[in-house]
A protein has these predicted regions:
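Extracellular/periplasmic, surface-exposed regions of secreted and cell-surface proteins
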Residues: 1-121, 256-333
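Long, contiguous hydrophobic alpha-helical segments, chiefly transmembrane helices and signal peptides
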Residues: 56, 124, 192-196
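Active-site-adjacent bridging/hinge elements
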Residues: 38-42, 63, 149-157, 242-251, ...
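Conserved small-residue
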Residues: 54, 71-169, 200, 209, ...
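Glycine-rich, aromatic-lined ligand/substrate-binding cores of catalytic
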Residues: 166-203
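N-terminal hydrophobic signal/anchor transmembrane helix of membrane proteins
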Residues: 6, 22-26, 173, 197, ...
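Short, hydrophobic/aromatic alpha-helical segments in well-folded domains
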Residues: 13, 159-162, 174-177
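Extracytoplasmic gating/loop element in the C-terminal half of outer-membrane beta-barrel translocons
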Residues: 195-287, 291
Length: 333
């Protein structure tokens, strides 16, 4: 073995073609083991800090990439159909990472964890109110397993198992489809993409500190109606008293609750294009070699898997791509 090798890579590729090329494509399998990746690891406090970003992590990446393409003559070369599908799947896992700090903050900020996917999401689970009427989350260091949400969570103990894994934020399954018809001098094409197997965090009521700080702002969100209706799936508002410590609500808990994470599967209709290629006999009279008139629509629509109909890639409060229309002419002399 090579002790200084930083990357172990295995790639298997299969190219195929059937029925005279009417169905063709390729299948790739890869398995990559990477060493000396940059990550935050634990070091001796004698260095003046207990953690440092160093080249000391190891990760396994494996997956497949599939391409399938076809072109069929329906009526000779005058009417044709074509299509191409691309699919990619990736699985990664942190194989080696030396850390001694597994406190709650490391899970909430997305630090790598040995044995887990690099993009695993962790969140608090709301456990209802305690006997004093204070909303609580599950936390292992408390005697009853509950942490009141108006107190700071234990950030010194090992928090393994406290926060629940919600899935991954990077889609492991990605698909793309390009298909179209050629009908005499007209071309009609469609581009569709899809991402599957991951989660996204939707926006919600932000539990502000009710104006007690200069930066406190209330987000006018429809979820506030659930609070007013007493929805037990969400933490209620704390009573506005001096000892309620409302600042802990939005600072430590309510922005990282498991009920905020939802299925991010979606299919996006990216582009529809119609092109008319002007007949050559017409072009010869005006001295053009080729010319075409086209119309295109971008961002046609979206199919989502979450009940809120949120766009997983452009959550509420961000700028979403608007549907656009393009008409143009292209030609060669």
């Amino acid at each position: 073995s090579n002790s200084v090798l930083k990357l172990l890579l295995c790639i298997i590729e299969i190219d195929y073609s059937f029925w005279g090329g009417k169905l063709a494509g390729k299948l790739d399998y890869y398995r990559k083991y990477s060493k000396d990746l940059i990550a935050t690891i634990s070091i001796s406090s004698a260095n003046g800090t207990t953690s440092q970003k160093l080249n000391n992590a190891e990760m396994l990446n494996s997956g497949i990439e599939l391409e399938v393409g076809s072109q069929l003559d329906i009526i000779g070369k005058d009417i044709q159909w074509y299509g191409n599908v691309n699919y990619a799947y990736n699985l990664n896992r942190i194989e080696r990472l030396f850390v001694t700090d597994n406190s709650a903050k490391t899970y909430l900020r997305g630090d790598f964890k040995e044995g887990e996917n690099a993009s695993t999401i962790y969140a608090w689970h709301y456990a209802g109110v305690n006997k004093d009427g204070i909303p609580c989350v599950e936390e292992g260091s408390s005697p009853d397993g509950l942490r009141p949400m108006n107190t700071v969570y234990d950030n010194t103990s090992d928090a393994t198992g406290w926060l629940r894994p919600q899935g991954v934020k990077v889609a492991p399954h990605i698909m793309g489809l390009t298909t179209g018809f050629k009908v005499y001098n007209f071309d009609l094409s469609l581009i569709v993409t899809g991402k599957f197997g991951h989660k996204f965090k939707r926006s919600s009521f932000n539990y502000p500190t009710m104006g007690k700080t200069g930066t406190s702002k209330i987000w006018v969100h429809k979820d506030v109606s659930k609070l007013l209706d007493g929805d037990k799936a969400m933490p209620p508002l704390l009573t506005d008293t001096e000892d309620s410590n409302q600042m802990y609500y939005d600072s430590y808990y309510t922005d990282a609750m498991d009920y905020l994470y939802h299925n991010a599967n979606h299919i996006r209709f990216q582009e529809l294009n119609l092109t008319w290629h002007i007949p050559e006999v017409w072009l010869q009279k005006i001295g053009f070699r080729t010319a075409a008139v086209y119309g295109q629509i971008n961002n046609l629509g979206l199919i989502t898997a979450n009940k809120y109909k949120n766009d997983p890639e452009f959550p509420e409060g961000t700028v979403k791509p608007e549907r656009s229309f393009i008409v143009g002419v292209k030609f060669n002399f």
